[in-house]
Amino acid sequence: MPGRRKTLFTLVVLFASGCHGWGGGPGTDTVEILSEKPSPNGRFIATSFYCEGGGAAGYCYWNASLRRAGDEVDQRDGLLGKHKTWKGFSDIKLRWIDGSNLEIACRQAKSEAYRDHVSEKVESRHGIRIHYILTN
């Protein structure tokens, strides 16, 4: 019996360590930059992007970000939606109104399943006010 326990323990440890990376995560995401628009003063960059990842469970989504020039895009710091790895927005277009106002036009999911998710949008970041236009 002790030999079986040792074998079972060894198998559990090997399985658990082998599955560690299967869940994906931000480091395994594939991010495609669709559009980048620098602010009029060049201090900020608005970006629309597509992201996929998540390992076996998988996800893909479109979103937008606003970052300081020189910073990398953080796909988990999107401006659109409550859950940062959910779909819910598409056809994202960016336009600077002026140096302190950014306009984001996009299509928004209408399904009841997305109601809570699409209800949240970041209103400002880095002192930039963000205006949303829904195109559907």
Where are these regions (language model features)?
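C-terminal motif of bacterial Sec signal peptides marking the signal peptidase cleavage site
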Residues: S17-G18
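Surface-exposed loop/turn elements that mediate protein-protein interactions on large endomembrane-trafficking
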Residues: G24-G25, L66-R76, K121-R129
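N-terminal secretory signal peptides
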Residues: G27-S65
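Mature extracytoplasmic domains of secretory-pathway proteins
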Residues: E52-E103
